[in-house]
Amino acid sequence: MLLRPLYSLFLLTLGASQLTACAQASDKTPAAIVPPGAGKLPWLRNLLDSSAVLRPHTVALVLADATTGEPLFAQNETKYFAPASNMKLFSLYAGLKLLPDSLPSLRYFSRGDTLFFQGTGDPTFLHGDVPSRRAFEFLQKAPGLLANCDIACSTSYGPGWPWDDFGYYFQPERGAFPIYGHTVRFYAQPPVGNVSSRLRVLPKSFASLTGPVPAALRTPGIDKDTHVIRALDENRFYVVAPFNKKWIDEVPFRTSRAFTLRLLGDTLRRPLVGAPWHPRATDVVRTLRGLPVDSLYRRMLRVSDNFLAEQLLLMASTTVGLHDSLSTQRVIRYVRRKYLGALPYPVAWADGSGLSRQNLVTPRTLEALLLQLHKEVPEPRLLSLLAAGGQQGTLRKRYHDAAGPWVWGKTGSLANNTNLSGYLRTKSGRLLAFTFLNNNHVADSGDVRNEMERVLRQVRARL
């Protein structure tokens, strides 16, 4: 009879001890982890939260000391954003890691009286803005027969690129042996005195493919700034603008193996044949070097040249794995695994230019990349590659100061997305790495850029 009261007393004691243990465990529950910099600079957080322009959409801003890496401020730093052309910073890093001091223009070997040559993705062959004549003169002066050898290459367009941008200058097709930047340039000259108006087409071989726009293509939907349009699936160009004033337009052309051979032969003004790339053990394969790499990096970053960024990854892929193809995805996988494994968050990396909306990155990851670039590249060289506020590139009309540039960065724009990542020199002399991302805004992009500048000017003045 005594066992039941004793058993009941035991259960009560055990229950009390468990309640005490639970209460103690509850007291020891760790506080939520606060990201570094999240609680700092309340004036800056208030500036962002109170902005009528920025408040309706998703905004991220991250600041860190570029030299020490000290976190200074962070808002939405762990969320994923579409970075647009900020992805070119990843392409730059890939090039810095994989390419030598000069670009690989082409690979070649000689056998008998024939020079066999193959593209490496070098975009500078007679390019309109970063032209190199090294490969052109090498091929033009080579004795004997020229045999161009094809090589497998990534698709003309990257994953997620908008198909209806095929006719705009900023989306040329990718390729193994680019010529003229894969674009045609049109120069309209208005009538002067007794000289009638005229249209100059470069390369000249495209003049015969250019004509007036048919009535069926003259639709109200054509942009008022459009001068020349191209047929979707062929190299037919139609002029839609009058010649009553001077204008210049640039339109991508369709690429193909046969068209490249014909255009290259016309350009070199000598016979050219296609052939397979089959070097023998006794053949010595060499690489012809072209322009210094910084000439490409500078143009790519300053004016945000998508074509150069895409071709940069194709060139970099010649240093990774076998030499049997040019592959954007191969070099992305390699760089991500070998050099970017320590990034705080994984990167969804789809292309070299940022044209694809499949690219996704967190602000904290972009900040880590900026800090890594500053650590590995001498500061004067690094800043010289980027657009500079008030001076050149995509920032030339913003961030002015009579004393000189104080913002160096890479802009990034897609419809409804406006971004900027780079470096900022404060009035105290401190260099900051920053990422300022704006996604899914319906406000005019100019208004968003104005507000970004207003915020960054406060950062410059107060830090």
Where are each of the predicted segments found?
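Short, well-structured active-site flanking segments
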Residues: 97-112, 274, 379-383
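Coil residues (strongly favoring Ser/Thr
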Residues: 50, 102, 113-114, 123, ...
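Active-site SXXK
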Residues: 69, 83-100, 177, 263-268, ...
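A small/polar active-site loop signature that marks catalytic segments
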Residues: 214-381
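Small-residue-rich helix-loop
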Residues: 72-74, 288, 313-463
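Beta-lactamase-like hydrolase cores
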Residues: 25-80, 99-102, 138-143
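Mid-domain, small-residue-enriched loop/turn segments at the edges of structured enzyme/sensor domains
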Residues: 58, 107-187, 191-197, 272-273, ...
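Bacterial Sec-dependent N-terminal signal peptides
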Residues: 1-35
